[in-house]
Amino acid sequence: MIIRRIDIENFLSHDRSLIEFKGTVNVIIGHNGAGKSSIIDAISFSLFRKSLRDAKKQEDLIKRGAGRATVTLYLENKGKIYVIKRNAPNQYTSEDTISELTNDTRRTIARGATTVSQKIKELLNLDEEVLKSTIIVGQGKIESVFENLPDVTKKILKIDKIEKLRDSNGPIKEVMDKINNKIIELQSLEKYKNESENQKIQKEKELENIKRELEDLNIKEEKERKKYEDIVKLNEEEEKKEKRYVELISLLNKLKDDISELREEVKDENRLREEKEKLEKDILEKDKLIEEKEKIIEAQNKIKLAQEKEKSLKTIKINLTDLEEKLKRKRELEEDYKKYIEIKGELEELEEKERKFNSLSDRLKSLKIKLSEIESKISNRKISINIEELDKELQKLNEDLNNKNQEREKLASQLGEIKGRIEELNKLLGNLNQVKGNVCPVCGRELSDDHKRKIQNEIIEKLKELDELNKKFKLEINKINGLISELNQIINKKSKEKDIAIRNLADYNNLLTQQQELRKEIEEIENEIERLSIYHEKYIRLKEEEKNLKPKYEEYLKYYDVTEEKIRELERQKIELEKEIEEIMNKVREYYNTDLTQKIRDIEKRIQEIKGKENKLRELDTLLAKIETAKQKIKQNEEEIKKLTDELQLLNFDPNRFQQIKREKEVLEKILGEINSKKGELLGKKEVLENDIKRLEEQIKDYEEKLKNKQKLITAYDKLKKLREHLAEDKLQAYLMNTVKSLVEDSLNSILSRFELSFTRVEVDFNDKNGIYAYTTSGQRLPVNLLSGGERVSIALALRLAIAKSLMNEVGFLILDEPTVNLDEYRKKELIDIIRSTVEVVPQIIVVTHDEELLQAGDYIIRLEKRGDSSKVEVINND
């Protein structure tokens, strides 16, 4: 599997970059900060949605000023092209895709961040931990694979997760503790179950005793109940007799009292009949009096009607005079009314033009004020800064800044070489001090004590020289850093001046444009106002005439409804009323000078006297009717008394015997009450016991249900315990480490056989932190830290590839980020040779560097440089 291409948009320092990888060894070169490592970050982000740098949030990966970043990676695997597209920030994860490219046609395989990551692992067999620990090599970290090799291997193999799994605080132990707690809980439940069963047996015995006691009470109750029913029946019969006895006595007494009262009422019958005959004679005069009263009232109403009509006649005469005067005034105002209507019509026609005239006048006034303000701003605005001169100054300053950056990078590179040389000499000095015997650890030749001391002294002298150079270069770099800081400040200041000048120029040009537009609009409005002024003058003149005529117009409207027809109608009404009044007066002439009201009062007084006698007559009729009724009632009551007396004799009721029966009934009720009370008490106890037994049965059933799982939990606990033991270091972990050790060693030695090295084989010990050993041709076993720099780099690269190949079957590419950091010239040349040799093992190598010497190793060169705040890509050659 190899990387064919990556497209970067708004990612870190890249605006829009398209990088193709066409060579076997692709060298990406550029100054520090040019955006080289950003390409490796983009590859990592494409594969795992994570960059290699420590970005706290995905927004940090987006280029400043942009809202979204997109990275598209093209991979070739087994003859197929896969396109992986990733987006940042997280709100765009749903747009992540992986597609298969066939004949320029894309077929989307998966969509969404999580699904795409799973598909990459499934299709390409890429593991994030393995890649980042082996074939993606960070800056100056080629040999870091030697450090803590067991820990690195465990991390790659996910053994650290196995250790966490079986840890005393891990998930297996946590589950075991939960199961054990459950087993302890079930043991307590078993104890509670036994207690519940004992309680159930005890309560069942109590229930049987209560049932027997209830049976005895039921027998006694049945016997007493029969006695009670007999006495109740007898008591009910006596109660009925008593009730009827009381009713009969009460009725007899009442009937006797009623007869006495009725006889008192009948004694005045003869006197009342004589009084009735006398009243009937007096009442005959009433009808004549009523007839005379009605005639008088009719005459009285007609006189009132005549008086009302005379009032109406008077009102009509007044209205008639008023209307005649108003009609005369209306005729005088008619000409002014017509003139006002005519002017009103003309004003309505001119209204729209007048509104337009006023609107344009207001607009003209507003525009002239605005024009005056803009002309004042133009006269106060001064454009004194030359933008072209500022551009030239900024260009010169940026060139100076780039020169200083290049100078600093060159010094930093030389300083790195010095540090690398110092480190190598210190290691060599340390190795010489550790050597036992007289054999050189590097070449295997004989080494005398004098020769050893001579080498040590030479190394110490060389270290002193290098230390002086180190201090000198640091001072130079600090001096250049100061100059770079000053240049950056000047550039920022000039950039701000340029931005202000551009804004001022834009504002000035905008004001000139506004001035021209306003003048044009003012001219157009003035022309239109001049055209409308003739209508405006006419409108003002007519408005004045309208104002003068309006009072007469409004007065005319008051008389608008006054017509000759209305006057003629009033005259007709006047004649009719005069005729009607004359006819009425002719009919009531006989009553005209009489006091009709007094006459009516006299008649009414006599009628009232007669009505009083009528009322008295009605009262007498009522009394006589009552007397007849009373006479009949006396006869009925006497007959009823005879019947009731006969019934009382037949009833045969004895009050003393009735009281004896009641006492016997009360005694039996008390006995039955005591029995029922005892039964209620026993039934309550019975219900409580039955509920307790039912509850205990359910409780026991629940305990039994829960205890079913006890054996399963014990079995599960034992299995987890065994699993935790098997996951220990001396079992599964040891098996995994030994299996991988064999695969890695075979692959490592197979790869190293293609390099020209002075040892026969290399051994890996994952239990040793420095567990890499090389065997010389003489069979000597040397730790990796005693080997030369070139040999260590060769083994480090081979080990990385071997681990990756063992865990991912196939390794298609190797990425080296700034591999020459801290290397001197000699070790750089060694690295170039090693890279060339590595091509035989891995089909694609990508080298990121600022070191021009590494161009010798590449067959496809990609150069990056920083322009402003953006990285720019340029392909140099493809030899």
From Swiss-Prot:
GO molecular function per UniProt: ATP binding; ATP hydrolysis activity; zinc ion binding
Any coiled-coil regions, as ranges: 184-304, 342-436, 502-722
SUPFAM superfamilies, per the entry: P-loop containing nucleoside triphosphate hydrolases, Rad50 coiled-coil Zn hook
Domain Zinc-hook residue range list: 394-492
GO terms classed as biological process: double-strand break repair
Xref: Pfam families: AAA_23, Rad50_zn_hook
InterPro entries reported in the protein's UniProt record: P-loop_NTPase (IPR027417), Rad50/SbcC_AAA (IPR038729), Rad50_ATPase_archaeal (IPR022982), Rad50_ATPase_DNA_repair (IPR054990), Zn_hook_RAD50 (IPR013134)
Induction entry: Part of the nurA-rad50-mre11-herA operon, these genes are cotranscribed.
Entry cofactors: Zn(2+)
Residues that, per the record, bind ATP: 32-38, 139, 786-791
Assembly behavior: Homodimer. Forms a heterotetramer composed of two Mre11 subunits and two Rad50 subunits.
Protein's recorded name: DNA double-strand break repair Rad50 ATPase
Biological source species: Sulfurisphaera tokodaii (strain DSM 16993 / JCM 10545 / NBRC 100140 / 7)
